[in-house]
Amino acid sequence: MERLFVFADFNWLGKAELVGELCYEKLRGSDSYAFKFDENWLKVHTGIKLSEDINNYPDMQYTQPGSDIFGCFSDALPDRWGRTLLKRREQIQATEEKRAVRPLSSFDYLMGIDDFSRMGGFRFKKEMEGDYINVSPSLKIPPLTEIRELVHASQEVERSEENDVLPEKKWIAQLIQPGTSLGGARPKAGVLDEKGNLCIAKFPSRKDDYDAGLWEHFSHLLAQKAGILVAQTWVLGGLGKYHTLLSKRFDRTAEAKRIHFASSMSLLGLKDGDNAQGGYGYLDIVDFILQGCCDVEKNLQELYRRVAFNICIGNSDDHFRNHGFLLTPKGWTLSPAYDMNPTLNEYQSFLINESSNKADINILLDSSESYMIKREEAENIIQEVQAAVSQWESLATQLQIPAREMAMFKERFKLNL
């Protein structure tokens, strides 16, 4: 059995505190995880719910048969892109060492992430008095000045994936440290801006047929005009046909302290793929806000505004990992909105009310009571969002988005204005 001591290094704690022990072993070919809270953590922080699948009591707790790692730790794991990098590194090492390729578990992925750039506020040790894992000074997040090399490396890795061959070791080595701490499928890496702030760089994919990075930046600016709290973004051109998107990490303070983050997926105890087809939707997030958040009214209004915006621009890639929360001394609160992109879809991936996922602003208005929003307030929010979205062509022109791409989304934007 392998074990890690879990520490909370949250920005509002005076110092890092032991949360508990995470254990892992492979039983009869299946991954098994266990977690035990530190008794002092439970005494001091009894009101904090870290994950739906971990209860606040002192006994050892186990994941359900067939389940993966506990939800609160899965939020710190890489998604498709980061896992691809780690898998290819393992294949390259196995080839060099003339051994069989070792299958990687979520525990392996957790062990492989750089401490500095890991999402959220958890840190891990193998020994109580030892150092945190993966804090080697040789592991450094590259500065923004190296972005061109990172873009090139990501394209070389994508090229090798297309050709079903292993990438050169140098490309993996360049991306493995900054690129494995982040979720999502697109090529990306962590970088430091000129002020030393930790940022996410999303690179153009070789598969892109439009400027996805520029449209995501557009969506964030438009959402900000609609009164939504958003992650700060900007774009870099001149690195290829399309733009690279930069997004400032919102789980770090100006002093680089860690703000703990959790996805609505882990806080609700859901899994990848839970969406409207399974009866899941925005009202599940409403339930969590009512039960687990501080500033309940403010968070409910913010969520309602985001749903209205998603409907108006067709942001339908809206899974539970794309709605996050930050932990404050008073409780959870919605994180800034992120990963917003227009699509041509006329249905949301989430139910808007109890039964419909049709992207119709009137369905949202008629469901205002389910969001605990008075109808008059709901009308005001929707009008403010529509007023902002109606300016979309002006903003797109200002950002020099090509007319061909603007024409692609024009009719979709009209649907709910």
Positions of predicted regions on the chain:
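Phosphate/dinucleotide-binding and metal-coordinating scaffold of catalytic cores
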Residues: 1-320, 324-417
